[in-house]
A protein has these predicted regions:
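Alpha-helical scaffolding within the catalytic cores
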Residues: 76-77, 135-143, 273-276, 307-308
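Short, amphipathic alpha-helical "lid/cap" segments that border enzyme active or binding sites
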Residues: 132, 136, 268, 272, ...
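Serine-dependent acyl-ester chemistry module
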Residues: 157-315, 320, 325-338
Length: 377
């Protein structure tokens, strides 16, 4: 068994495959070294949002670039406070499926919307790895000032899990966001209360990671599971840790399934509350809020029918305008296979982005046409 375990050079933790072994308690020097790494050129830490797209940022390979407003767009494109005459402006916020991970700018669904309707100006404020909480906060800070006609909140079902998380490491120990922390909303007296704002950084974050059981903030992190963090006498045996870690991965997968299904209502409840707050804010700006549910490959078969996704049901029960793109994609995948829409990493392929844009435009068209007939539309 020792032969199949390794040590991660980035965080000093023992690994089985790409997964850290229990307990999920990184060494303080590993956390400090990670935090002291040079900032990236595209996605950067942000005290209000956890992380964001850097204004004017660019990845080394040039696949992703941002304008001065932090939107995914050519560096020389500026949106300003108002749309161009005769254009309807849509601002889109969400996670990597809104951002367009894995595809170039011209292959994002936002650019496809603009190609299909010349009267649209679609601003891409998606950020890789976001929860719905971060997307809402990005709307408030960066999207509202663009004064759109429509604001689209993209939600991928995994965001239900992210919305219960504070430090990404505990949700995704093997993930690509290291030890970054993020804001978290909780429901208190039928209102949303914001936690971890500004977000944990520096030594306070180090202390939370190395002694998580004594961190008051992490009591609100669904994924900082005490049994995963506790030190046990048997853990000096790496083989025992490896077996325990594999079993724990299956338990965590079951927790996710319960959240998607609403059997554990915590994730859907806070996600719906965030979407309601988003809709209220958008309406106060004089714009139309729309929630767009972006399909998750692993759930397509289970929730293939119209209004079968529990999150969609809960959002509609609160009278929110919802466009669920899961059913049309489920039909397409059933007919043509996953490769018709999805890349190897389960993000949308260029073709998947085009399909999504077409379905989305069909459902948006009545609202868009009505807005065109209004003064200023």
């Amino acid at each position: 068994m020792r032969l199949i375990t390794t040590t991660n050079p980035d965080n000093g933790m023992a690994m089985i495959g790409r997964y850290p072994l229990l307990p999920y308690r990184p060494a303080p020097e590993a956390v400090r070294a990670w935090l002291q790494r040079p900032p990236g050129g595209y996605v950067v830490a942000d005290s209000e949002l956890g992380w964001t797209v850097a204004p004017g940022g660019r990845t080394p390979d040039g696949l992703y670039q941002a304008n001065a407003e932090g939107a995914r767009a050519p560096a020389d494109r500026s949106y300003g406070e108002r749309s161009l005459p005769g254009r309807l402006r849509l601002v889109t916020v969400g996670d990597s499926f809104t951002h367009g991970d894995g595809v170039g700018l011209e292959d994002t669904w936002q650019r496809e919307l603009e190609r299909r309707r010349a009267d649209l100006e679609v601003v891409n404020l998606g950020v890789p790895g976001y929860g719905t909480d971060q997307a809402y906060l990005r709307w408030r800070r960066d999207g509202a000032r663009l004064n759109p006609h429509f604001a689209l909140l993209g939600i991928w079902p995994e965001d239900i899990c992210r919305n219960l998380n504070v430090v990404r490491f505990f949700l995704q120990p093997a993930g690509g966001f290291g030890f970054l922390s993020k804001p978290r909303f909780i429901r208190a007296d039928d209102r949303l209360q914001t936690l971890n704002l500004p977000v944990l950084e520096g030594e306070p974050l180090v202390r939370a990671l190395i002694d998580p059981l004594n961190s008051p903030l992490l009591r609100h992190d669904y994924w900082a599971i005490p049994n995963d963090l506790e030190l046990h006498s048997w853990q000096h045996l790496r083989v025992a840790r490896a077996f325990a870690t594999v079993a724990n991965l299956y338990r965590r997968r079951e927790l996710r399934q319960r959240l998607y299904a609403g059997t554990d209502p915590a994730g859907i409840e806070v996600t719906v509350a965030i979407a309601e707050a988003f809709a209220r804010d958008v309406r106060r700006k004089g714009a139309v809020p729309v929630v767009v549910l972006i399909p998750m490959l692993d759930l397509l078969q289970r929730y293939a029918e119209e209004n079968s996704l529990p999150l969609a049901q809960a959002l509609r029960a609160r009278k929110l305008d919802v466009i669920d793109l899961g059913p049309p994609m489920a039909r397409l995948v059933h007919e043509r296979g996953p490769s018709s829409c999805f890349a190897a990493d389960s993000h949308l392929s260029p073709e998947g982005n085009r399909w999504l844009a077409g379905w989305l435009l069909d459902r948006l068209a009545p609202w868009l046409d009505a807005a065109r007939g209004q003064p200023g539309g």
